[in-house]
């Protein structure tokens, strides 16, 4: 189940990356990241949603570094499913 969630996570990240590259609406991307990280935070045992929201805002304030949140957000899962992150 956890692996499935991780695959879904990376699939979503990939679509965000494509969205950011095509440079559509940064406001939409910002809102999506907020929901994205908040949603993932509720699924995994993490600190209260308060910190999640703060984190999400910090990550989405720059306009285009989609690769940075991609690396910093799923750190715990990346360690567990390192077979997947290698592909």
UniProtKB/Swiss-Prot annotation:
Region (Disordered) location: 46-87
Segments of skewed composition (Polar residues): 57-66
Keywords: Signal, Virulence
Signal peptide (UniProt feature, chain positions): 1-20
Role, per record: Putative function in virulence. Could be involved in promoting S.typhimurium survival within macrophages.
Protein name: Virulence protein PagD
